Amino acid sequence: MNNLLCCALVFLDISIKWTTQETFPPKYLHYDEETSHQLLCDKCPPGTYLKQHCTAKWKTVCAPCPDHYYTDSWHTSDECLYCSPVCKELQYVKQECNRTHNRVCECKEGRYLEIEFCLKHRSCPPGFGVVQAGTPERNTVCKRCPDGFFSNETSSKAPCRKHTNCSVFGLLLTQKGNATHDNICSGNSESTQKCGIDVTLCEEAFFRFAVPTKFTPNWLSVLVDNLPGTKVNAESVERIKRQHSSQEQTFQLLKLWKHQNKDQDIVKKIIQDIDLCENSVQRHIGHANLTFEQLRSLMESLPGKKVGAEDIEKTIKACKPSDQILKLLSLWRIKNGDQDTLKGLMHALKHSKTYHFPKTVTQSLKKTIRFLHSFTMYKLYQKLFLEMIGNQVQSVKISCL
């Protein structure tokens, strides 16, 4: 008899638990003194507290939590929990307190929580790469670079990189790499030409200068007819009109014209004259010897489609340090349908704090943008443009500036 009673009680307990867990809203058992019965009452939802248990006649009464108090689950408590008052040192408020959530604090970028303190993420030394990036809750995990990989920098983000395959770039292996440095390649001068940039920053600024602020209906046709050298054919002009906005058409036309006439004296003269601009840009940017991780951060900060790690690797191998930023900016422009590189750079500078650029790099990029927009360069662009198209369309361009 006792065994039968025990089984019945266990079954009843399981049935009640199943009922209270599976129904919605969730239920709880409450003994009602007035009727001397166990009642199945509704629990209170998140953001409220239990004001009055249910009765045989009335449902459970719940009331909203007051300011600075919360409950984050269905419950039977007659009071709300007090929100955490402040975040710890080196933390920021990820989510403010409200009636359904406690204040959520998180360590600032580059730090993680260890007991009560936000400690700086570990930086992996040369010869070691990041295998698990640090998070606000976890430290960086480093591991020694395996055979065929290397890391030549101290970084909390950079993984080990694969040794350069010299033969891919038409070069010879002169010194085998190890865990702390890459393979060293050498080759003839022809191999160094692989860092070619189709349109430099100065040329792009010059070509975009040629875009009139006010368009005449036949501006592109006038420009096509008056450009010296080999003419851009009608089919190409129509394709440019179909595929690009009015603001982009002039840039695309001049870019194509330059490619078709690269051996013409007029193009060579323009390139020579614009060397003044190129030398100044090199003075601003060329000295910035950035690591792989810093170059990747710069590319990540640009809007639109990103230049990937593989392209950055190839650029580091094919270009000398002074040309690497310019080459990557050229790749970004091509990848994004010839978007304005200077506008992309200005976007990157607005978000430079997020990506932790070195101060010297930020200053160099700002100086470059100011220089390319300066009155001195404006006068040079105007002079070159009028020399290029001759006197026949001077009045058209000048009226549009």
UniProtKB/Swiss-Prot annotation:
Induction (free text): Up-regulated by increasing calcium-concentration in the medium and estrogens. Down-regulated by glucocorticoids.
Subcellular localization, as worded in the UniProt entry: Secreted
UniProt modification remark: N-glycosylated. Contains sialic acid residues. The N-terminus is blocked.
Keyword Repeat belongs to the record: yes
GO aspect biological process, one term: signal transduction
Residues spanning the signal sequence: 1-21
UniProt key word Secreted: yes
Chain positions carrying an annotated carbohydrate: N98, N152, N165, N178, N289
Transmembrane intervals: none
UniProt entry keywords in alphabetical sequence: Apoptosis, Disease variant, Disulfide bond, Glycoprotein, Receptor, Repeat, Secreted, Signal
Site for Involved in dimerization, residues: C400
Annotated S-S bridges: C41-C54, C44-C62, C65-C80, C83-C97, C87-C105, C107-C118, C124-C142, C145-C160, C166-C185
Primary subcellular site in the record, as a coarse category: secreted
Pfam families: Death_TNFRSF11B (PF23630), TNFR_c6 (PF00020)
GO molecular function, one term: heparan sulfate binding
Renumbered ranges of TNFR-Cys repeats: 24-62, 65-105, 107-142, 145-185
One GO term describing the cellular component: extracellular matrix
Complex formation: Homodimer. Interacts with TNFSF10 and TNFSF11.
Involvement in disorder: Paget disease of bone 5, juvenile-onset: An autosomal recessive, juvenile-onset form of Paget disease, a disorder of bone remodeling characterized by increased bone turnover affecting one or more sites throughout the skeleton, primarily the axial skeleton. Osteoclastic overactivity followed by compensatory osteoblastic activity leads to a structurally disorganized mosaic of bone (woven bone), which is mechanically weaker, larger, less compact, more vascular, and more susceptible to fracture than normal adult lamellar bone.
Function noted in UniProt: Acts as a decoy receptor for TNFSF11/RANKL and thereby neutralizes its function in osteoclastogenesis. Inhibits the activation of osteoclasts and promotes osteoclast apoptosis in vitro. Bone homeostasis seems to depend on the local ratio between TNFSF11 and TNFRSF11B. May also play a role in preventing arterial calcification. May act as decoy receptor for TNFSF10/TRAIL and protect against apoptosis. TNFSF10/TRAIL binding blocks the inhibition of osteoclastogenesis.
Name of the molecule in the record: Tumor necrosis factor receptor superfamily member 11B
Origin organism lineage: Eukaryota, Metazoa, Chordata, Craniata, Vertebrata
